[in-house]
């Protein structure tokens, strides 16, 4: 279980904890996410995808009694500020029901055109005002 991680996890017992209040703001307010340059990732699979995308993580929130299953996510416990959140408090901040017992806060990336890194033979598709944007890539 999470026993050997408890030394590096800061305990949170109340849903009124300032860290959880900030997390809730990031979940609910796009303006807050943009202002802080942060976003919330829920679930271990999504966190692993963000790791592959080389996102920088600032915080990790794990439900009390849970532990990350993958070594990559376990390694984040040593690289970020990590919290062990009491079950009731965690359920109040979590947006998904079920087995997702981990949340992360990561820094947003700039997706401006001037920051785009292209290979020498890149294929670029420009689409302006598509009628059904959901069909792009289908």
Residue map of PLM features:
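RNA substrate-binding interface of SAM-dependent RNA methyltransferases
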Residues: 52, 83, 110-138
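Glycine/small-residue-rich loop that forms an oxyanion/phosphate-binding "nest" at active or ligand-binding sites
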Residues: 77, 82-97, 102
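Boundary-proximal intrinsically disordered activation/regulatory segments immediately upstream
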Residues: 5-65
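Short, charged/polar "capping" segments at the starts of alpha-helices
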Residues: 65-72
